[in-house]
Structures are given as C-alpha cells and as structure tokens.
Amino acid sequence: MASFSRLVRFLARDGKTYYGDAILPTGVTDIAKARQARIVTGDIFGRHDVTENVADIRLLLPPLAPEHVKTVRCLGLNYANHAKEVSLHLLDPRWIRLMANHLQSNMAIPKFPVLFYKPVTSLAGPTDPIPVHPIAQTGSTLDYECELVIVIGKAAADVSEDEALNYVLGYAVGNDVSHREWQIQRGGGQWSLGKGFDGWAPFGPGIVTNKVVKDPQNLKIFTKVNGETVQNNNTKDMIFGIKKTISFLSQGTTLLPGDVIFTGTPEGVGMGRKPQLWLKDGDIVEVGLENVGSCTNKVEFSKLKSKI
C-alpha cells in the first residue's frame, strides 16, 4: 500500500524534520546505518510521494510523529518458551490467581492474546536514552524485551486473518522496557504501570514495508546487553502470529492508522535467567530484527528524587 520501502523520520542536517525513504548501501539491511533518505511528502497513510530530493540524516527519530500515533497495544506471553520462563515459580501468587482463567492447563500458554496498553508518551526513538524515573529506581527489577512491532496503515475493523496484512503499513523493532516489581507485585494485576513509563518503548529504526519483509513470521530477533547476546530467536515461534493478532485485536475494536502493536518477546528476559539479569544505570541495550535493523539505547537513571 505504500510507495516507500523503509520509512524513516529524521532530523536532517539542515535542521528540519522529515519523513523519508532510507537509502542503504548495497548489502546493508539495518536502517540504523542509513545516512541519507529520499524525502517523502504528503500523507504517509494515504497519498504521498517519494521525491528525488535527498537529505542527509543527522539523527533518526521515533518512526512516527506523536500526532500520528493513536494507540499503543502490546501482547504479553506470546512466545511459548518465554511464557514458560516466567511461569509459576517466578510470579507473585496474586498475579497467578488473576491470570488463571487466561492460561491453558499447563499454566504457561495463553488461550487468547494477553493484551495491555502503553501510553503514547512511552514511545521513544532508536537511539534515545531509556530514562529510569525515580519511581522506577526502587528495587532491582529493570528488564528488557525485544519485540516485532506492527504499524497499522489503514482502519481495520473485524478483519479476517486472510486479509489482516493488507492493513499493515510496515514493521519495526522495539524494546518493551519493564519494571517487574511495578508490573507484577505492585500493579494490581494490570501490567501498564510497570511498562508504561515515559520513554519505555523505544522503537524503529524505521518502518519496513512488505516490499522488503515478505514473511514477517520468519525473522530473526535478538537483544544484546553491553554487547552480549541475551535473547536470540525467530518470530516464527510466536503463539499468536501477526495475522491472528491483527484479526483478533480488530474484533469489535477498530484499529486506526498509526496504531502500534508490540507483539511480545521471546525467552531470555532478565527475569527468567539464572542468575537473573537486571538492567543498571549506564547499560547499553540493543534490540534487533532481521531485515529491519536495530535500536540501541542507553539506560539513564534520573537524578531527581521521587515524591512517592
């Protein structure tokens, strides 16, 4: 549906912000390595034009302008091995009781997609710092989650799985940054508090269309912390695939152009490792998706004191 292949939003060297179609060197697929882009004019969700005007990229920004994002939906427990690694022995008993009706008999695999929301203010760019606000500095349970991100391109209501991909603008990679204590012990059964802080959903580095990603259900996905690989999987291992996810979420609830869907993370999160691995001030977190690229973000603890 889109005439661009790799949509980026960027600050150019002339000081202006543009949408553009990233220009990559031969053999390079990581949009984060783009240094130039052809400027895109018009409506990225409708009539637009990829011009011949080329601009130098100074900084890659969040792929969508704030006014273009309507809702940020997220799936939890959408890879079987991840669901198992965060099963009973790792979780607060109150959370287990709340989730009991949503899980299959083995207590690990959801019957239906597990949906939660993040505020639009949680979105950040592919190189922005991950701000750890004073309220989230209590405890040592700061975690990472690499995820394939779907960007909806046109309104989708009650769509079938067969037609679901027709409503996709493209795909990005994101990090569903999580504070497990606020998510599980303090969240009252709701996950948004522990996952929805400002800047806790960096994504990008651009939006890749189906011109490039022929099969979004077979892409390598990974996380590195300070250069060490801690997650390494493939999107084919999702419990609820991309077609199923879009169709399910559109039943009775219209998905709008600009809606963003984080589709869950594979195994290897800090909470599930032995010993557990929690993010610290100054850590560098890289999440990557095959044929899309990577986001590299530094964890930065705020120096302000919390009022709570």
Residue map of PLM features:
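Structural signature of FAD isoalloxazine-binding scaffolds in flavoprotein oxidoreductases
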Residues: 91-97, 108-126, 142-144, 280-291
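Short, conserved beta-strand element in jelly-roll/cupin
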Residues: 116, 144, 149-155, 254
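RNA pseudouridine synthases
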Residues: 149-175
